[in-house]
Amino acid sequence: MLLEDFIKMFEAELADIIPGTLLPETVYKQLDAWNSMQALILIAMVDADYGVTLTAENLHDCVTVSDLFSVVQNKKTLLNS
């Protein structure tokens, strides 16, 4: 699982985001496209593509795209151990 792949999938799910504009340090909650519907879409994407469940608390605690990726990666590691 690579951060770059996660970012590409995240971009694909966000409305009005030009591919290649998100960076690991992007504060995703400050994006114009970010809203509660996008949060639900992200939760569904992570479940479908990575097999882990993000919670509202996870989204609240994370600040950057990289933070989100770290949570997904950690949850995936726990599932596989």
Placement of each model-derived feature along the sequence:
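Phosphopantetheine-dependent thiolation modules in NRPS/PKS and related acyl-activating systems
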Residues: 1-43, 48-81
